Each structure stands twice: as C-alpha cells, then as structure tokens.
Amino acid sequence: MKRAFMTLFAVLAVLQLAAEEPAPSARLTLTLDRALEIALNDNPMIRVADLEIQRQDYVRKETVGNLLPSLSASGSYSYAAIKQTMSRSGLTFGGDNTVSLGADLSVPLFVPAVYASIKMNRTQMEEAVESARASRLSLVNEVRKAFYNLLLLRESLDVLHESESLSQKTVDDTQGKFEAELASEYDLLTAQVQLSSLQPTIIQTEGAIEVADLYLHMLLSLPMDVALELEGSLDGFADAAEANAYYSTDISNNSDLRSLDIQARLLENQLKVVNAQRMPTIAAFGQFSLYGNDMPEINFGDAGWGSMFPDVDLAKYPDLVAGVTNALGPAGMADLAGLMGDLLGGMGSSSATTSHSFWWQHPLTFGVSISIPIFSGTRVNQQARQTRIAIEQLQLQREYQEESLGMQVRSSISNLMTARSKMAASETSVAQAQKAYDITDARYGGGMGTILELNSAQLQLTQARLNYTQAVYDYLAAQADYEQIVGMDYEVAGTEQNQ
C-alpha cells in the first residue's frame, strides 16, 4: 500500500513538473501570399473597414424605411373622481369611467427628400467600399515591405555570419603561421580585430530582426509566441517582379482619386437633398378611434314622460333624447320628469330608470394630406450655396491631387529603374569582390600577400554582398509603392480581392 502511494505521488510530481514547463512555441511557415491572406482576413483595420460597409448598409435601409407605412396605436383610461357640474343646481354630466383607444396610419405617397437621401446613401456605400479598398491597398503595401525587410535582415545576417566564418578562418590560419613563426604578432592581432569588429554589427542586425519580426506579427495579428519561418528569397521575388514588369502612368484606379470622385457625387446628391426641401410632400392617412364611458342612460319609457305621453314614440327622437340625457344627467332628468308631471297634473311617475352599461363610439377617418413649403427664410438657399462652393473646392482639390499623383507615379517608375540599375551593378560588384578575395586569400596563403590586403578584400566582399541585398530590397519596395500608387489590387487564388 505504501509503495502504491509513493508511485502515485511520483506520477503526480512528474505531471506537475511537465505542466510547469513552458510549452514549445508554435511555428508558422509563411509565404508572401499566405502572409497577405492572413493580414487581409485578420487585421483589425480591415475588419473596421468591413464593419463600416455594414453600417452604411443599415443607414441605407433606415432611409428606405421612411417610404414604408407607419402605424401607431394609443390608449387611455380615466376615472372621474369628481364630475364637472353644469350649474349651481348640482347637475353633473359625464361617466365615471372612460376608455379611449386609437390607431393612426400614415402612408408616404410622394417624398422627394427621401428619394434624394436614398441616392446619397448609395453613394455613401460606394465611399465606404472605396475606403475599405484603400485600407487593403495600404495593408498589402505594408505587409510586403515588412516581409521583404525581414528577409533583408535575415539574409544580411547570413552574409555577416559568412564573413565571420571567413574572418575566423583567417585568424586560425594566421595563428598557425604565428606559431610556426611565419607571421608576426601584428598580423595575428589584425586578424583578430577584423573578427571582433563584426560582432557589434551582428548584434545590431539580430536586434533589428527581432523588431521586424514583431512588426510583421502585429500586421498579421498573430500571437507573439508564434515563430515565423519565411519562405522565399529576395532574389526570387526580384526575378518574379522582373518577369512581370510593366509600368504605366495610368492613375485612374488610384484610391485617392476614386475617393475624390465619390465625394463629388456625394456632394451633388447632397445638393439634391437640399433642393428637395422646396418640393411638396404628399401622404395618405387613416385614423380609427374607439371611445367608451359608463354615463347613465335615461329610459323615458319607465319615467314620467312615458306614461305621460303614451301615444308618443320617443325612439323617433334619439338625438334629442341623447342630448337632453347627456346635458342634464340622471338627477336632472328625474327633476325634469317630476316638474313636467306636476305641470301636467301629476301624470306619470316623477322618477326615471337609468342604465349603467358602457356606451361605445368608433369613428373612422381616411384622407390625403399635402405639405407645400412656401417660405422658410433663406435657410434652403444658403445651404444650397454652401454645397455648391464645396463642390467647387473639391474639383480644385481633385485637379491638384491628379497632378501630384502624376508626379508620384513618374517618380516611382524612376525609382524602380534606379533600383534595377543599382541591383545589376551590385551583382557585378559581388562577383568582382568575390574574385578579388579568392586571389588575395590565395596570395596570403602562399605567403605573398599581407593580412591587410586580405582584410581589405574580405571587407569589400562583405560590403558588396550587403549592398546587393539592400539593392534588391529597394527594388522590391519600390515595386510595392508603385502598385499602391496606381491602385493595383491584390488577388487571392485568382479572385480579385477588391472590386
């Protein structure tokens, strides 16, 4: 039993230690297309832009709702604790309990302002879609350059490590020669200094890689504990860009210009909304009411008048009977019956019977209403003038923006050509520096060259490789900037991401 308990305790301890050990971080292999796809799906700014499109759709539906019929109902109940009297005699009128129900129906028939607002809402939807497209273009540009920058830093680090290996080889060779008394201590120290001087650059590059990696994580909305493995190389992306290179100065798809065009249409629709305030509106309406109270109703057949005038059919005079009953009330009618009985010789009874059931009325009304604006000061005129001035301002702004973008696209193409030339020149420099290093290394190994010549050749080779890597990145970054300026949409799996 004790052994079983100890075994169980040991198993639990192992499980506890395993739980306390940090889980290995996940690894994600990223191609450029995969990185762009993740960013376009998960980046918060893209989701905000998509939500704005949904919001504008609800705004449009809200405006359309103004063309639909509206129906409202109301109801009330009141109890007369103290009734209103007609005179000093104390005669009262009205019921103790009153119920009122009602329904109102309104159907718009001609509403110019709503029609203009619906057109404006459609333009607002186009503006939201174009804003989302601009966000996607900007994000694609940022992700591409962040991806290229991380590749640049990692390839630069590889170049520095290769240079470090060459320097270490030189130190080892010089150390052997020094021990064999074939090289001076100065040569050994020079080789060691060359090796040590690479460490600060390597450390700085490693720090830059960490920052670039964090930035790419942020753009892709990925957890920071996910390790990224990038597929592809700068040379491969440059070759693909060269194969598909076609540069045009057409800026008709530029997002800024398209946004200005949409804003111009939006202002024109706004002017129509303002002018629609001058036009009449027509609507149909209907009203239904239901009223009820428990005002006592006098039955003249049981009162003095019925026996007093047996040959008179009081049902022929309902309005008179109802009017007198409502005006005098039960007590007044009883007094009136008694008075008439006394005047007519005591004929009939001096009292009348009453009924306390609810009396209901239900009037129903239909009609058409028209509202014609006649004079509202100068409010509408001033609003129209303000909108026209805004349209003129936007036209001037668009002309300036078009000229500016024309300059930018030409400058971008010039940067592409310059970067391509630098890339070709740097590639030639790498080949020349490699050949010079091989010759110098052979001379130094044969005892004909000096350590200074070897260090200089190695430094030139390292710098040439770094310059070439930087030139390739500059070319790819210029390509990304050019595509953003001309408004080239990114395509996913053969389907255009933004229409």
Regions found by a protein language model. Give the residues of each.
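Amphipathic alpha-helical coiled-coil segments
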Residues: A49-T63, S135, L139-D158, G176, ...
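Bacterial Sec-pathway N-terminal export signals of envelope proteins
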Residues: A19-S76, M224, E231-Q270, M279, ...
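Residues on the lipid-exposed face of transmembrane beta-strands in outer-membrane beta-barrel proteins
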Residues: Y77, A103-L109, L216, V368-I372, ...
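Acidic, low-complexity, intrinsically disordered peripheral segments
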Residues: M6-T7, E20-S25, A81, N299-G304, ...
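Transmembrane beta-strands of outer-membrane beta-barrel pores
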Residues: Y77-A81, L109, F288-G292, I372-I374, ...
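Sec/SRP-type N-terminal targeting helices
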Residues: R47-L51, V64-G65, L109-R136, Y186, ...
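Short flexible linkers and secondary-structure junctions
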Residues: E20-K145, N149, T205, I282, ...
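Periplasmic alpha-helical coiled-coil/stalk elements that build and connect Gram-negative outer-membrane
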Residues: S138-S255, Q263-R265, V274, N415, ...
